Structures are given as structure tokens and as C-alpha cells.
């Protein structure tokens, strides 16, 4: 491996933020970008009507509702490292998109609201991280408000999320009594100095817990802090890098992201300790980031990042080798060589053309309908990266057009929006219905809104007699043909061209499985791999 490739790979830190909605994920995303020098002015998310919206929530509907529904990617340099931050949807209906984003990162940051503690969505996301032993750092947010006792929160994280907590910073009071944090490793008190927006103002730093200046400024709270810390140090774990990298321990930081406080301490430790690019599993072997030849996989497709150009961008995670502009790469699924001269890098919606990209980087490829989620790109080797799932939807609706003459635009719009992977399109074999499947109700609203805004199609979604769907496959070609003839009324083609059994009831599905034992019914399907 060339020394430049080795150096650049070692500099990369690629991570995502996970949290329950409203724990402050978008705010902390903004502040990380602010401290990383990537944006001059953080647009606070609360002022949704204001002209400045949070940088990472760039799609129109997100701006209206104040929730992030698509993962965007932001890159910024910090202390000699290159940080790739993947923002994930904050709404539970978009769990599949979040799940796939978590396949493209090497570590994660968990944000917890000090008043609410561990919430349901956080538990689900942690389960996903645990499946891959993803290293996790934790930021307990909103210390400028009243909340629960920090020691109780650590206990809850340990009990509910089954991960050891190692506090790195410790809060001095909270709400009106919030005075700052004590950095355990550096033996320094960082005094709270709230600033908003783009101002970074560093409060006074007092070296040493026994410094008389502390008593002078904090009065009785200084003695309280010393007492509390004695208790904390005795009851909690001290930071162990090997345990953190194995996904068994989480370093914990406290702060108030909206007030730009406590974020820099987190970022400093993150670039120091978080893992660089890790090896990746394929169907045939494990790919090491140090390998010379380029490889990567697509974990997300986003339509219309630029409403002026009706474009679709495929987000590719570089896994090995160096990507350089104008390079010829091999798209494994369709066995086609393509030259890529206009790949993009991201600063939320601002796009710049890539000259070179290294393992850990995320690049955007222009997609004209030929790239799918899960696609592997290499320099010729027939590799398929694994672990990028497609889930069977839980809710189904039939598309209803207000103007029947717009059928062509509706089909095109649904096909393109479904390529993003948050919703799935099914075309029954025996009628002309267009059935949309989703994980949650919000997705139908999003699709209707985007059809109107981006394709000028006025459509609504009505109930349809479908309760569940399964991808079907069979090794016996004759039996499969017979099954397709006899069960045609329940079969549909999905937007990837695969055959799906759509069942009106769970009982119907059970009966079909009993009647056709040779046919396999799949609840999930690997992207990039036919069922």
C-alpha cells in the first residue's frame, strides 16, 4: 500500500448520530460542523419559519416539519483528521434508511436527552449497532435544562442498553445551576459560557479539582462536585479504549449542544479514539481498507438533491483502494464497466466534485436508473458486500391519481422515489394497480408531498387489501412456474424486478407456505443480491 493511501486512510473517521426524535441530534450535527469549521453560522432548528434552516435538514418537507427524514452526508477536517458525518432520519418511520446508514459507518454517537433518558428509538438503534459491534460514544444533552440525576442516567444506559459507561466529562449542576463540566481525564473544569448560532466562545478553564479559584467561582457547588466525583469514580468504569473499540463500553460526555457547550470536548476525544476505516465482509472474503484496488458499496439513493436538476445521487462508501476522478470501475450486479468523472463529495446540500476519495469517504454517483441500493463497485473483482438489508413493508396503500392522464409521470415518480429505499413499489401481475409499501404512515405523506413538489403529480394513497409481503424464490424451476401460474392473483413485481407474494391476511400467507413447501418466502432481502 502506498504511503499516501495509508496516511489518508488512517485520517478518516466515519460515523453516524443515533438518538430518539427531539434529543437534539440535528443541533449536535450542526455544532460538530461549526466546531469543525465547516459552517460559519449554525441555523438553529427551533426557528423553523426562519430563513436559515438546519444545514443537514435540507429537503423541503423536512424544513416544514422540523424532522430529518433522509440521511445526508457531511465531511469536514478537524485536528488533522477528515471526519465524515452521516446524518440519519430522526423519525421512526424511516428506520430502514437509518439501518442502512449504520452499515456504512465505523462508529456512532448516541445522543440522550438528560430529562428523558434512554428512549425506545435509541434502544432499537443500539440493537442494530450491537449486531455489528459498532463502537459508541454518548453525549447527554440539554444540561441547561432540569433533568434526571447523571448517575441515574448512567445506570439506566448500563441496565437497558447493556453497555458499560465510562464518564469522560461530568456536569456541575444542571438547569439554572448548570456551571460547566469537569473533564476527568484532563483534570480540568470548563466553565459554562452559553453562546448561540455561529459564535464559539470558550469559557474559563480551571486546571485541577483542588484549585481555590474553583471555590471562589462556584461557592458551595465546588465542594458538592468533589463529593459527587468521589462517588462517581468509585462506582463507574474508567475509559478502556479496547473495550470501547469492541463495542462493550461507551465514553460519556455531558453538555448543551444548543449553547455550543461540551461539544468540543466530545469532538477532541472522538478524533483521538474513534476507529478509522474497518475491514468489510463480502460474500466471498473480507476486504481490508489497506488493499490497493478500489471497492465500495451503495447504501443509499437520494432523488432530487438539487430541484433545479432532476437528479438522483447514489451514496457510495469507499471500502478499499483510492477512488480518483475519471476512473473506470466495474458495477458487479450488471457486470458493466463505467467511467466516473463527476463523483461528488458533500457538505449537506453543497456539492463539490471529488478528485480523490479514500476508505471511509462517502462519494455521490449520478444515477440514471442503473444503480441500486446494495450495488458493489470494484476494479474488476466479482465481490458483493453483504449486510445491507431490505425489509418487507408493514403498511400498504394503492396510489390514486386525480388526473388519469398523468399515469406516466406517476409511474416514473414512484419508481425513482422507491429507489431511495424508504418505500417499496409493487405492481400486481393481474391488474394495473400501483401498490406502495412502507414501514410507517409518514412515508405515504412524504411520497405524496414529493410527487406534487418534484413531479407535479397530484396523487393520494388509499387502503388496499394487502397485509404483508414476502419475496419468493425456488430451486425447482418447474415447481416455481406452477406456483406462479396458480398464485398469480397474489403475485407482484417489485421496483427491482423481483417476484413478491402479497398476502391479504397472515392466514393467507401461512396457507400459501403450507401449500407450496418448495417455495421460500423471505421477509428480508439483501440489497444487491436477488432473493
Curated annotation (Swiss-Prot):
UniProt GO molecular function: GTP binding; GTPase activity; guanosine tetraphosphate binding; translation release factor activity, codon nonspecific; translation release factor activity, codon specific
Q: Which HAMAP family did the record assign?
A: Rel_fac_3
Main location group: cytoplasm
- Protein's name in the database: Peptide chain release factor 3
**In the UniProt record, what gene is named as encoding this protein?**
prfC
BP GO annotations? regulation of translational termination
Location(s) in or outside the cell? Cytoplasm
Which family, according to UniProt? Belongs to the TRAFAC class translation factor GTPase superfamily. Classic translation factor GTPase family. PrfC subfamily.
Q: Which organism is it from?
A: Thioalkalivibrio sulfidiphilus (strain HL-EbGR7)
Which residues are recorded as binding GTP? 19-26, 87-91, 141-144
Entry-linked NCBIfam families: prfC, PRK00741.1, small_GTP
GO annotations of cellular component type: cytosol
Q: What is the lineage of its organism?
A: Bacteria, Pseudomonadati, Pseudomonadota, Gammaproteobacteria, Chromatiales
Q: Where is the tr-type G domain?
A: 10-278
Function, please? Increases the formation of ribosomal termination complexes and stimulates activities of RF-1 and RF-2. It binds guanine nucleotides and has strong preference for UGA stop codons. It may interact directly with the ribosome. The stimulation of RF-1 and RF-2 is significantly reduced by GTP and GDP, but not by GMP.
* Origin: domain of life: Bacteria
Record key words, sorted: Cytoplasm, GTP-binding, Nucleotide-binding, Protein biosynthesis
Amino acid at each position: 500500500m502506498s504511503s499516501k493511501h495509508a496516511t489518508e486512510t488512517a485520517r478518516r473517521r466515519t460515523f453516524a448520530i443515533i438518538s430518539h426524535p427531539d434529543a437534539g441530534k440535528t443541533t449536535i450535527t450542526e455544532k460538530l460542523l461549526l466546531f469543525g469549521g465547516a459552517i460559519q453560522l449554525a441555523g438553529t432548528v427551533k426557528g423553523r419559519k426562519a430563513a436559515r434552516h438546519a444545514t443537514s435538514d435540507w429537503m423541503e418537507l423536512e424544513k416544514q416539519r422540523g424532522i430529518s427524514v433522509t440521511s445526508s452526508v457531511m465531511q469536514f477536517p478537524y485536528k488533522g483528521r477528515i471526519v465524515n458525518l452521516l446524518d440519519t432520519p430522526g423519525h421512526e418511520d424511516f428506520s430502514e434508511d437509518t439501518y442502512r446508514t449504520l452499515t456504512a459507518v465505523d462508529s456512532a454517537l448516541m445522543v440522550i436527552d438528560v430529562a428523558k433518558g434512554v428512549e425506545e428509538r435509541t434502544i432499537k438503534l443500539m440493537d442494530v449497532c450491537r449486531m455489528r459491534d459498532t463502537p459508541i460514544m454518548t453525549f447527554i444533552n440539554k444540561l441547561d435544562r432540569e433533568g434526571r440525576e447523571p448517575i441515574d442516567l448512567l445506570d439506566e444506559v448500563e441496565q437497558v442498553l447493556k453497555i458499560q459507561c465510562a464518564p469522560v466529562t461530568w456536569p456541575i449542576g444542571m438547569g439554572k445551576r448548570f456551571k460547566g463540566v469537569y473533564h476527568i481525564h484532563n483534570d480540568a473544569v470548563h466553565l459554562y459560557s452559553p453562546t448561540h448560532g455561529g459564535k464559539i466562545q470558550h469559557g474559563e478553564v480551571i486546571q485541577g479539582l483542588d484549585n481555590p479559584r474553583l471555590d471562589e467561582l462556584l461557592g458551595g457547588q465546588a465542594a458538592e462536585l468533589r463529593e459527587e466525583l468521589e462517588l462517581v469514580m468509585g462506582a463507574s468504569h474508567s475509559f478502556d479504549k479496547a473495550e470501547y473499540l469492541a463495542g462493550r463500553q461507551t465514553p460519556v460526555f455531558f453538555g448543551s449542544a444548543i449553547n455550543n457547550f461540551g461539544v468540543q470536548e466530545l469532538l477532541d476525544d472522538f478524533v483521538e479514539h474513534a476507529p478509522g476505516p474497518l475491514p468489510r465482509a463480502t460474500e466471498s472474503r473480507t476486504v481490508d481498507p489497506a488493499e490497493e484496488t478500489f471497492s465500495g458499496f451503495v447504501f443509499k439513493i437520494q432523488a432530487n438533491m438539487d430541484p433545479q436538476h432532476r437528479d438522483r445521487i447514489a451514496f457510495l462508501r469507499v471500502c478499499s483502494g483510492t477512488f480518483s476522478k475519471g476512473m473506470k470501475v466495474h458495477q458487479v450486479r450488471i457486470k458493466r464497466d463505467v467511467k466516473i468523472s463527476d463523483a461528488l463529495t458533500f457538505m449537506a446540500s453543497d456539492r463539490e466534485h471529488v478528485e480523490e476519495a479514500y476508505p471511509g469517504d462517502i462519494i455521490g454517483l449520478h444515477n440514471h436508473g442503473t444503480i441500486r441500493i446494495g450495488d458493489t463497485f470494484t476494479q474488476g473483482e466479482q465481490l458483493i458486500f453483504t449486510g445491507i438489508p431490505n425489509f418487507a413493508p408493514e403498511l400498504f396503500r394503492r396510489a390514486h391519481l386525480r388526473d388519469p392522464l398523468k399515469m406516466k409521470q406517476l409511474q416514473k415518480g414512484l419508481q425513482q422515489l422507491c429507489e431511495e429505499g424508504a418505500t417499496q413499489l409493487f405492481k400486481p401481475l393481474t391488474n394495473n394497480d400501483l401498490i406502495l409499501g412502507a414501514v410507517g404512515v409518514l412515508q405515504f405523506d412524504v411520497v405524496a408531498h414529493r410527487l406534487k413538489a418534484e413531479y407535479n403529480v397530484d396523487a393520494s394513497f388509499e387502503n388496499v387489501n394487502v397485509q404483508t409481503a414476502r419475496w419468493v424464490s425456488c430451486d425447482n424451476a418447474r415447481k416455481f412456474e406452477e406456483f406462479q401460474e396458480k398464485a398469480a392473483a397474489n403475485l407482484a413485481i417489485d421496483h427491482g424486478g423481483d417476484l413478491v407474494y402479497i398476502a391479504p391476511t397472515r392466514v393467507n400467507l401461512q396457507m400459501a407456505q403450507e401449500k407450496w413447501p418448495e417455495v421460500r418466502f423471505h421477509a428480508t432481502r439483501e440489497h444487491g443480491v436477488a432473493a
